[in-house]
UniProtKB/Swiss-Prot annotation:
It is a peripheral membrane protein. PANTHER family: LP21163P, REGULATOR OF G-PROTEIN SIGNALING 6. CDD domains: DEP_RGS7-like, GGL, RGS_RGS6. It is found in: Cytoplasm; Cytoplasm, Cytosol; Membrane; Nucleus. One of its GO terms (cellular component) is nucleus. This is Regulator of G-protein signaling 6. Pfam families: DEP, G-gamma, RGS, RGS_DHEX. Regulates G protein-coupled receptor signaling cascades. Inhibits signal transduction by increasing the GTPase activity of G protein alpha subunits, thereby driving them into their inactive GDP-bound form. The RGS6/GNB5 dimer enhances GNAO1 GTPase activity. Its main location: cytoplasm. The gene is Rgs6. Residues 40-115 form the DEP domain.
Length: 472
């Protein structure tokens, strides 16, 4: 009955947007609803209930729906079945016939199935003009069940002010709809009125209720074209659809061009070559990183020596004055090349090692380029020339080893010097030091002796500081 009446009312159903992020949910719900209405496969009993001086057609009780969900979906807990029923009702597929709040109750409350024409899978985005026609039509029918609720009366007054210039047209549309409805059978009209009311309860919900039609911004970003083409519930032509005072009108969907397809192919080819890690590998890397740096996080591991501003222990200042790196500091240099570069003492130790091997020009060039980026603009050109003459010019006293491609780019950049003139050369030298010089430094006796000396001297330093504090 509901399906047939919905088809008669339809002005023209547009094809559902299969790209909608909610379409998977809608399909699952509609599969449940279809089975629920199928009498041949044991659906929910739909019946006409006799009331005082009237009949209530095509209704089911909340208890029947909950029991059907528990039986056919293997749900053991009634609370879970009620929750699932409420989620289905919130989307407008099932609705209470006497309440604007779309929820499920496990009692004798009467519910009715929504017509397929009004299903959310049709991607409705109704205009406020349609809502104004609906509310205006309700006021023309002197029936208790069609009286406006308080929030609906407020909405009607607001819409009347917003559409003051075209209210006459809206009123005429509402009158035309009322005339059409009066020609229908009384029972059919009663069902259609409730289904129409439920449709607007979904798209213009009661204040305090969740609007299930609002799109999640994260889902919208995954859409190829998140904009929808708005369509009128009552078949109002495009020229009469004015800009909504609430919603921003959508633009027509642009046709896909050859350039769009080429860009998509290029993007997909890049995705094929992209190295993707499994979540298990990512988790392992994150755990390993956390375990490696846990002793350097003062929120997790108490700092040694302690912060003198908190504990009144000046051991940290004594160590800093001695300019000898602590064991933790030396150990951290071995974590990565960046760790030793961002530590002043680490850079000094690394530079001494490179000087002993007569290969310090790479690090000095890298540090000079870093310093160039911090220079005042008026000194940049002069500093660029100095770096070029020292490291890259023919016959430079500290010539560095660059590949031909990087050297050619740098030569062009020097003609119009700036802070990032040596960016390519610096990156090449960085990779060279990371793969060669840094690895040799970690294996060198200089680093190993420094690390072992700190381990051996830790207890002696503690005893010496303790003795100084006792004597004072």
């Amino acid at each position: 009955m509901a399906q047939g009446s919905g088809d008669q009312r339809a002005v023209g159903i547009a094809d559902p947007e299969e790209s909608s992020p909610n379409m998977i949910v809608y399909c699952k719900i509609e599969d449940i609803i279809t089975k629920m209405q199928d009498d041949k496969t044991g659906g929910v009993p739909i019946r006409t209930v006799k009331s005082f001086l009237s009949k209530i057609p095509s209704v089911v009780t909340g208890t029947d729906i909950v029991q059907w969900l528990m039986k056919n979906l293997s749900i053991e807990d009634p609370v879970e079945a009620i929750h699932l029923g409420s989620l289905i009702a919130a989307q407008g597929y099932i609705f209470p016939i006497s309440d604007h709040v779309l929820t499920m109750k496990d009692d004798g409350t009467f519910y009715r199935f929504q017509a397929p024409y009004f299903w959310p899978s049709n991607c409705w985005e109704p205009e406020n003009t349609d809502y104004a026609i609906y509310l205006c039509k309700r006021t023309m029918q002197n029936k208790a069940r069609l009286e406006l609720a308080d929030y609906e009366a407020e909405n009607l007054a607001r819409l009347q002010r917003a559409f003051a210039r075209k209210w006459e047209f809206i009123f005429m549309q509402a009158e035309a709809q009322v005339k059409i409805d009066r020609k229908k059978d009384k029972t059919e009209r009663k069902i259609l009125d409730s289904q129409e009311r439920a449709f607007w309860d979904v798209h213009r919900p009661v204040p305090g209720c969740v609007n299930t039609t609002e799109m999640d911004i994260r889902k919208c970003r995954r859409l190829k074209n998140p904009q929808k083409v708005k369509k009128s519930v009552y078949g109002v032509t495009d020229e009469t659809q004015s800009q909504s005072p609430v919603h921003i009108p959508s633009q027509p969907i642009r046709k896909t061009t050859k350039d769009d397809i080429r860009k998509q192919i290029t993007f997909l080819n890049a995705q094929i070559d992209r190295h993707c890690l499994k979540m298990s590998k990512v988790a392992e890397s994150l755990i390993a990183y956390t375990e490696q740096y846990v002793e350097y996080d003062p929120f997790i591991t108490p700092a040694e020596p302690s912060n003198p501003w908190i504990s009144d222990d000046i051991t940290l200042w004594d160590i800093e004055m001695s300019k000898e790196p602590s064991q933790q500091r030396v150990k951290r240099w071995g974590f990565s090349f960046d760790e030793i570069l961002k530590d002043q003492v680490g850079r000094d130790q690394f530079l001494r090692f490179l000087e002993s091997e007569f290969s310090s020009e790479n690090l000095r060039f890298w540090l000079s380029v870093q310093d160039l980026k911090k220079q005042p603009l008026q000194d940049v050109a002069k500093r660029v020339e100095e770096i070029w003459q020292e490291f890259l010019a023919p016959g430079a006293p500290s010539a560095i080893n660059l590949d031909s491609h990087s050297y050619e780019i740098t030569s062009q950049n020097v003609k119009d010097g700036g802070r990032y003139t040596f960016e390519d050369a610096q990156e090449h030298i960085y990779k060279l030091m990371k793969s060669d010089s840094y690895a040799r430094f970690l294996r060198s006796n200089a680093y190993q002796d420094l690390l072992l000396a700190k381990k051996k001297g830790k207890s002696l330093a503690g005893k010496r500081l303790t003795g100084l504090m006792q004597s004072s």
